[in-house]
Curated annotation (Swiss-Prot):
Transmembrane segments: none
GO molecular function terms noted in the UniProt entry: DNA-binding transcription factor activity; transcription cis-regulatory region binding
Gene3D superfamilies: Periplasmic binding protein-like II, Winged helix-like DNA-binding domain superfamily/Winged helix DNA-binding domain
Listed name of the protein: HTH-type transcriptional regulator cbl
Species of origin: Escherichia coli (strain K12)
Residue ranges of the annotated DNA-binding region, renumbered to this chain: 19-38
Key words of the record: DNA-binding, Transcription, Transcription regulation
SUPFAM superfamilies: Periplasmic binding protein-like II, Winged helix' DNA-binding domain
Length: 316
């Protein structure tokens, strides 16, 4: 048994048992992946995967138990590799933050400025992606902190802390008829072409749910990943825009006006996520503390390092 075999078991579960994708993620060949699986099954005397011909469909009960143990072993191995750095490089290094465009552009600048004053020798890397991509980066150890409004709070491999709550607001031209309606209604908004975020990011599900509850179908003519793109097309007259309220900026003041829609759409929460059980340098804990003053470094450490491992029934 070796680490590569355990990595293959873990990656197979992550890639929905597609061995081609497993091989790509681990920079090896598909034949090599298959060989490692066969050798591990022969060594343990069990079948790890449910098969149909050569295709993997899922995990057997022993395979599921093995996956829990493999996750634990690989996580602890990662912690061992981090250990020396934790004690020798406490105030310098690289902090990698995976986040959405909206948070990187509008929510993080002041926090990053304060962080740099505390840790001037720490370099920062911002990776922008979708909530799903952010969660994957955290799970794979490719990011230290993940920040998003969706997904991070319900992933068992991650620990998530609330940062702040926000609502959507409506962007329209200054002379738009909706500026004369108070309070705004979903029915009045649904009459106009709408530009907003694409599925799966920046509270899009809250928008869809609000219209669905009223039995309305919004005319979404364009969906985008970031607020600045939405603003651009609203300014061009393609439609009205639903954007995060924190995405305000000077560039919109000349042509656009924001209308309050807090009474129409449910609030969203921005979450700060870390990989559960993973050791971190002190500056990682401090960054989270800067974001959420209600959490102490000790509280954050305790929750991240607490075990939530599945109980394994060894009487399979």
């Amino acid at each position: 048994m070796n680490f590569q075999q355990l990595k293959i078991i873990r990656e197979a579960a992550r890639q929905d048992y597609n061995l081609t994708e497993v091989a790509n993620m681990l920079f090896t060949s598909q034949s090599g992946v298959s060989r490692h699986i066969r050798e591990l099954e022969d060594e343990l005397g069990i079948e790890i995967f449910v098969r149909r011909g050569k295709r993997l469909l899922g995990m057997t009960e022993p395979g599921k138990a093995l996956l829990v143990i493999a996750e634990r072993i690989l996580n602890e191995a990662s912690n061992v590799r981090r250990l020396a750095d934790l004690f020798t490089n406490d105030t310098s290094g690289v902090l990698t933050i995976a986040t959405t465009h909206t948070q990187a552009r509008y929510s993080l600048p002041e926090v990053i400025k304060a962080f740099r004053e505390l840790f001037p020798e720490v370099r920062l890397e911002l990776i922008q992606g979708t909530p799903q991509e952010i969660a994957t980066l955290l799970q794979n150890g490719e990011a230290d902190i993940g920040i998003a409004s969706e997904r991070l709070s319900n992933d068992p491999q991650l620990v998530a802390f609330p940062w702040f709550r926000w609502h959507h607001s409506l962007l329209v031209p200054h002379d738009h008829p909706l500026t004369q309606i108070s309070p705004l209604t979903l029915e009045s908004i649904a009459k106009w072409p709408l530009i907003t975020y694409r599925q799966g990011i920046t509270g899009r599900s809250r928008i869809d749910d609000a219209f669905a509850r009223k039995g309305l179908l919004a005319d979404i003519v364009l969906s985008a990943q970031d607020s600045d793109v939405i603003k651009t097309y609203v300014a061009l007259g393609l439609g009205i825009g639903l954007v995060a309220e924190q995405s305000s900026g000077e560039q919109e003041e000349e042509n656009l006006i924001r209308l309050d829609t807090r009474h129409l759409f449910d609030a969203n929460t921005v979450w700060l996520g870390l990989k559960r059980g993973q050791l971190q340098r002190n500056y990682v804990w401090r960054f989270l503390e800067l974001c959420n003053a209600g959490l102490s470094v000790e509280d954050i450490k305790r929750q991240v390092m607490e075990s939530s491992e599945e109980e394994i029934d060894y009487q399979i």
